[in-house]
Amino acid sequence: MEERARSRLLRSKATLEQDIKASYLMDHMISDGVLTNDEEAKVLSKATRKEQAVALLETLLRKDNRAYISFYNALIRESYGDLASLLHSDLPLLSPEGEKSFADGVSPSVQAILSVGGVPQRPVVFVSRPPLLNLIREMLYQLRDTPGWVTVFGMAGSGKSVMAAEVVRDRSLIKECFPDGVHWLSVGQCERADLLVRMQSLCFRLEQCQSSDTSQRPPSTVEEAKERLRFLMLRRFPRSLLILDDVWDSSSLRSFDIQCRVLLTTRNRALTDSVSGVRYEVPVENGLDEEKALEILALYVNGKMHKLPEQARSIVSECKGSPLVVSLIGALLREFPDRWSYYLRQLQQKQFKRIRKSSSYDYEALDQAMDASLQVLEAEHQELYRDLSVMQKDIKVPAKVLSVLWGLELEEVEDVLQEFVNKSLLFRDCNQRPYRYYLHDLQLDFLAEQNRDQIAELHKKMVRQYQRFYSKRPPDSADKDSLYWYQFIPYHMAKAGLSKELYSLMFSLDWVKEKARIMGSAHLINDYVEYGEILDKENSEVRVQFQEFLSLNGHHLEQRPFPDVVQLALSQPDRSEVYRQALMQAQKRASRGQIYLNWVNKNIEEGLSRLVMHPHQGAVYYACFSKDGSKIASCGASKALRVFKSTSGEKLLELQAHEEDVLCCAFSPDDRHIATCASDRKVKLWNVERGVLIREFEVEHEEQINHCQFTNTGRRVLLATCSNDKFTNTRLWNPNKKTSQNTMFGHMEPVNHCCFSPNDLYLATSSSDGSLKLFEVSSANEWKSIDVDSFFPESDEEIKAMVKCSTWSADGSQIICAARNTVFVFDVETSDLLLKLKTSRLSTIQFCHACPNSSLLAVALSHYTVELWNFESSKKKAECSGHLSWVHCVQFSPDGSLLLSSSDDQTIRLWETDRVHTSSAVALKRDTDVLSSHSDATIIAPDSSNRLQVLSGSTGAVVLESEELSSRIRCSCISRNAAFVALGSEDGTVQVIEVPSSKASVKLSGHTKTVHHCQFTDDCEILITSSEDSTIRVWKWRTGECMVLQGHMEPVRKFHLLSSSSSPHLFSWSFDGTVKVWDLTRGQMLQDLVCHEGAVLSCDVSSDGRLFATTSANRTAKVWSSASWKMLFLLEGHKDCVRSCRFSWDNKRLATGDDNGEIRLWSMLDGALLKICPRDTKDSMNSYHAGWVTDLHFSPDNRVLVSTAGYIKWWSVESGEALQTFYTMGGNLKKIHVSPDFSTFITVDSIGILYILKRLEGEGT
């Protein structure tokens, strides 16, 4: 019976006893089914009318709401209207609608049942957890027709008891499954005597609910109490639910194995293994989500969630949403609302004793609650559990690691861990095989605090056990269970204070190689940053050397197949410890026949980027720093958003953000959110910490969205976007609303970029209509407009000079924008042009950004470089080379110390602003020639200043440098006696220069277009040149006499000179698809062969002169007979243009290379395909060789093949496997010069760096 009705009966009891005649009323109540004949007989057995009335009312008080209503109706029918009126105001509601109408969702009838059963009321502050409640209810419905057990288990303070009480506040559940009531018993940790008292109390409560007047004595033993309960449940309460709260051990639980329906809460999920009957389990998650936890704190302090201080989120994060901790701190804050920072500090400092009881929880302080779980373990297991103090937060550990730590068999360890899991002392991730184990943050903090004085020793134990177990060989990198050691053994060494062991490990190239193979470079770099202070005490220079090696080669270490780390390390400066270790290892391996190359002329410049990252598969369109500079976000053609540490490149977040290319991303002023915009016309807002979508704004732009940016300060946060729309192309958004707040009108063409002024008062927009506009943010009105196109007088009226981007000076007084190859600096107030900076005429500016605390301006260019300018002095301060394709974006860090650049080459480079400078070394062009001798080589190459340089082949030192030429040098060659150098120019002229005087000997005119190739004959008397004008010229260069070989219809890019006993012949090939053979003495065409339908891209002649091969843009290669001039083999299979070919020295094989980076080896016996190099492994650029295969050379013994494309590779001719790879700084190698003994390799890359590579010989060779 509900409380109000029972109270009314008790208050009216005296009046009713005086007036009613029980015998008249009982007939009606028996008819209604609320009174039995036995109960009527007991009442009538009383001697007097009043005694009968007293007995009837006593019986009625033990009944439910239906009995109250039946009694009320009987009073009406027997004309006791005045008495009925006493009861009328508290009549219970029995209709379903009435049951649901109460504010807290719990009807009085349900509340009455729960009160009788001793179920605790809701806590003062309560937040529902519907998914968990539904799961428990679902399990309880399984007990509707049969007895059984439902176990709700979880760690201390996870909210088990609150959920168990809440789940039965459900009328439907009680009516359908437990109509005979719900009974609650708190068990806890108790001895047998205490357990008997609790069971006696339950027996008494159940007996009170019966109508029997006989009072039984309490049971005197646990066994008797168990039998009494069994009888009561089976006979009197067959469909009731017994809730056992906080059960600790199986012996206590067995005392309630009485074939009834039981819901129990416990920290030990395995308890029900000791009882009979069906069993169901419901795990309770360790923590609430952030929103629920904040809701609890808000309720405690009577505030709104969005008005809670920032410390509230930190408290929730620190305790991982533990319901117990949140409630304890919330209750304390109710008394002391200004102590947010204090309680956060106590949590961070693990001062659990100060977070003391202020709720109905059983323990005085948080540490007591956690210690209680630990005390039930055996002493031996307590020691093992203590060792877990060395675990890191959020790190899941395999059992094999703990097997090493404890020195136990794996099966024994798994048994111990199972016990810890069962007691909610440890958690198991079953989604991984083998299982991974982890501690809740609070448990770990508690352990760390409890064992504070022994932490170093515990870490030392971890290290010593690791060293003992892996003394003979390191952990197997292929074994997933061993990955823990690679990730965390430096951490344990540092925490143990084992500095020497840490130096030895981290200053080892073997360790670097193995860890990089498994985890990539970012983890390693992070280790050098994390433990830098310890390592620097040993040798700060060596620490920097290892860190720089990883930073500059990190993108290579992401490649699969994994590169040879020893070869990468050989490119480090000779003074570097990394180089010293690599050289020792390389010499040992070279003794066994392996190929290693030493870069003898390396000069690692200070201006190189300090960190190279490869975050995306595809172009990186945009990257930006967080406001605190600790993180970098990037996006691009991969459609993904990625966030990583700016110190190491370690990935923090990666998610698929859009369905099309993501063009821009931006951090919010507080760094908690990131906005993204894309080609799919969508703008999205993401939570950085959790990686979840917060909001997808309405699609209001009609075309792709090019850029997005938040305001710089958090006073009034707005997001600006701009797009390719014709009119409504710039919008302002409130991050809390799905629709835009304002639209800025003015541009009639796409807007490429937008940015807020430093004080957020203005928004600058850069448009394809040739203008730069400034809008007032508050009104969205146009404030100023600058016609940038008007500063290009040569501009076509119909094609405007597109303004690509803009940026504000640090003080906001100047606005800087870029169009074509020019940077303009304007005064904001007057719109006057203050300065104009012109970059290379051959490039266009893709992006620019002004340093936030200086007058430096970074400019991203289409010709793969980044330039730094001082926009006050108009001077170029530095040029940053290294990217292999267009640079899309540049941005300074908030403090101006770093500069990032993102590129089409899929990388992001990080530069130190004060270390980059304009290189003193002149960049060479790739149009080189090399003359090899037994002891040395001579290299000639034009440079970026259009001078010819002659360099030493052993050191790369400049021997000679010509005057600057007026027309761009496009080819060069050196005579066999090294006395003369020839140059072919873009204007068609040819010059011969004497060496070493650099005196211009002769200038030859005749070609009308670019000269592509030149070569001296062996006697140095004849110079042959080929040109874009389709002709070949044979010069007696000393006299200027010339013979013209005409016949080709398209440019002649190259030719091949053949010497024979009779007369010299010349092979030439052209884009017209033909190969022609010429007699050089008479200038006569001997053969004119139509070889391919497409352009002929390369040709080679076998060493015996019997065969020649041609390759074409039509994806085929052909082999021809020099005797019959007929085709012998058609070689098909390449999937792209076949750009290079080379016969082996024994003429048994032909190698061909294509624009997809693939190399094929063919038999010259029958034209059969022998090998494909590589077979199926593409690199990070989705190519087999990072670009076109431009050159091929066989070793003299025909066992090795070297190739050039994006880098240099050496291949086994027999197996087709790669033997070695040398990664150049730049890419797009044009050719490689190989010494006759195959020991020296010389090339120049796309950024003008010369490589003289000498093959290392083995030790003692």
Curated annotation (Swiss-Prot):
Question: Entry's PANTHER family?
Answer: APOPTOTIC PROTEASE-ACTIVATING FACTOR 1
The record places domain CARD at: 1-90
Task: Tell me what gene encodes this.
Answer: apaf1
Subunit structure of this entry? Monomer. Oligomerizes upon binding of cytochrome c and dATP.
Note the segments forming the WD repeats. 615-654, 657-696, 700-743, 746-785, 798-836, 840-879, 882-921, 964-1003, 1006-1045, 1047-1088, 1091-1130, 1133-1172, 1184-1223
Instruction: Name the residues that bind ATP.
Output: 154-161
From the broadest rank down, the organism's phylogenetic lineage runs: Eukaryota, Metazoa, Chordata, Craniata, Vertebrata
Q: What does this protein do?
A: Oligomeric Apaf-1 mediates the cytochrome c-dependent autocatalytic activation of pro-caspase-9 (Apaf-3), leading to the activation of caspase-3 and apoptosis. This activation requires ATP.
**What is the predominant subcellular site recorded for this chain?**
cytoplasm
What is any one of the record's Gene Ontology cellular component terms? apoptosome
Residue ranges of the NB-ARC domain?
106-417
Keyword set, alphabetical order: Apoptosis, ATP-binding, Cytoplasm, Nucleotide-binding, Repeat, WD repeat
> Does the UniProt entry include the keyword Cytoplasm?
yes
Gene3D superfamilies, per this entry? 1.25.40.370, Death Domain, Fas, Helical domain of apoptotic protease-activating factors, P-loop containing nucleotide triphosphate hydrolases, Winged helix-like DNA-binding domain superfamily/Winged helix DNA-binding domain, YVTN repeat-like/Quinoprotein amine dehydrogenase
A single Pfam family, by name?
NB-ARC
Q: Which SUPFAM superfamilies does this one have? A: DEATH domain (SSF47986), P-loop containing nucleoside triphosphate hydrolases (SSF52540), WD40 repeat-like (SSF50978)
Offer an example of a GO molecular function term for this protein. Answer: ATP binding
Compartment list: Cytoplasm
In its UniProt entry, what is this protein called?
Answer: Apoptotic protease-activating factor 1
Q: Which organism is it from?
A: Danio rerio
PROSITE patterns hit by this protein: CARD, WD_REPEATS_1, WD_REPEATS_2, WD_REPEATS_REGION
| A GO BP entry | regulation of apoptotic process
